[in-house]
Amino acid sequence: MKLSLKLALVLVLVICVSLLFAAGKGDAKKGKEIFTAKCVQCHGEKGEGRPAIEKMFSVKMRPLSSKEVQSKTDEQLQKEVLDGNGKMKPVKLAQAEAADVIAYTRTLAAEKK
């Protein structure tokens, strides 16, 4: 194979992989809307957790802005949202909606600073 053809194939591959990863990122604005509709009842307006929920389920909720939560990968967070985590039941969302919620929760750490 000619060198120029090999370079062209590598370039196409790099572009495709970049687009694939870019497509996986959510929309924080949409995520805030979904969070408000489906998550705020337990997690609170800014993801700080609600004391009544903690008491009801005998759990200590980590703030979504915490280092412990923010250090998780998007994939880990998506699994927790879609499959549930401990006493948190799975949330019925499409994968794209879950990605949007995760993008929004990433903004909570920035607001904390």
PLM ranges: what are they?
Residues 56, 61-64, 80, 85, ...:
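Short, functionally important structural connectors and interaction interfaces within domains
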Residues 5-6, 38, 47-51, 55, ...:
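Membrane-targeting and insertion segments and their boundary/processing signals
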Residues 29-33, 37, 75, 79, ...:
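Solvent-exposed, polar/charged alpha-helical surfaces in well-ordered, non-transmembrane soluble domains
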